Amino acid sequence: MQRDEKLFELTLDTVLQRLNDLKLAVLSMIQKLELEYETINWPTFLDNFAIISSHLTGLTKILAKEQCPPLRNRTVLPLLVSMDRDDTLINITEGRVPVFSHDIVPDYLRTRPDPITEQKMLQNEQKAANLTNDAAMKQVTQYNKVVSHVLDMVSKAREEWEIESSSRTGIQQTSSMADTQLLVAAVGMGKGLKLTNYGPGPGMMVPPSIRAPSPMGGPAMSPGNVQQQLGKAPSAVKTNIKSANQVHPFSR
């Protein structure tokens, strides 16, 4: 008798520990859904769901062991029902149940489902029992047709996607990323360009200070002087010195 009681207490402790782990996993998942719904991604959600599933699997294995006493054969009876506030009960239930009253006992110590749920379950069981084999086979056949149709649609979409992906990889590349980067660097920052000094060409603009003289008079400048003037900065003060012996070309 004592051995059975010890085994029963050990089983209850293990079940309570698994239930606490399951509760923490569910709370963590609910917290992420409520607070991190904008940043949570699908892999993180699947990881949390896998943790909850592992806790449920472990709890099921504990209850399915042969050493575990059949808990369904035991009945939980309330020893004291009171309308007064119970601090110990609040601490055990983490603030969820402040009073162990007559209104709470049927909900927390219920060994059967709610009456509405139990009625729906009985209706479904009766409906399943009244179903004939021919009707069941027809429904199964129809269900298999729907599943096969959906599977064909998914397979066709997958084949089209694979064909499109393979055709994209076979297209010959007509541009070079390295050449494009060199061209952009040369145009934008002048990278790789060399600066050379040449005389003014026929299409280049020449500053007025070094422009060739007009027919009004004045000495012509050689290309060397023009290049020398191009290399110098123009003076801030402009002077115009004329010779006294210069004759106006139109004074005849």
UniProtKB/Swiss-Prot annotation:
Superkingdom in the source lineage: Eukaryota
Q: Which organism is it from?
A: Drosophila melanogaster (Fruit fly)
Upper lineage is: Eukaryota, Metazoa, Ecdysozoa, Arthropoda, Hexapoda
Question: Keywords of this protein's UniProt record, alphabetized?
Answer: Activator, Coiled coil, Nucleus, Transcription, Transcription regulation
Summarize the subunit comment.
Answer: Component of the Mediator complex.
Instruction: One GO cellular component term, please give it.
Output: mediator complex
Task: Write out the similarity annotation.
Answer: Belongs to the Mediator complex subunit 8 family.
Q: Extract the Gene3D superfamilies matched here.
A: 1.20.58.1710
Keyword presence, Cytoplasm: no
Q: What is this protein called?
A: Mediator of RNA polymerase II transcription subunit 8
Q: What is its main location?
A: nucleus
InterPro entries membership = Mediatior_Med8_fun/met
* Annotated coiled-coil segments of the chain: 117-142
Look up the record and give one Gene Ontology term from the biological process aspect: regulation of transcription by RNA polymerase II
Q: Spell out the Polar residues composition-biased ranges.
A: 237-252
List the GO molecular function terms: RNA polymerase II cis-regulatory region sequence-specific DNA binding; transcription coregulator activity
Q: Which PANTHER family match?
A: MEDIATOR OF RNA POLYMERASE II TRANSCRIPTION SUBUNIT 8
Q: Region Disordered: start and end of each range?
A: 215-252
Q: What does this protein do?
A: Component of the Mediator complex, a coactivator involved in the regulated transcription of nearly all RNA polymerase II-dependent genes. Mediator functions as a bridge to convey information from gene-specific regulatory proteins to the basal RNA polymerase II transcription machinery. Mediator is recruited to promoters by direct interactions with regulatory proteins and serves as a scaffold for the assembly of a functional preinitiation complex with RNA polymerase II and the general transcription factors. Required for activated transcription of the MtnA and MtnB genes.
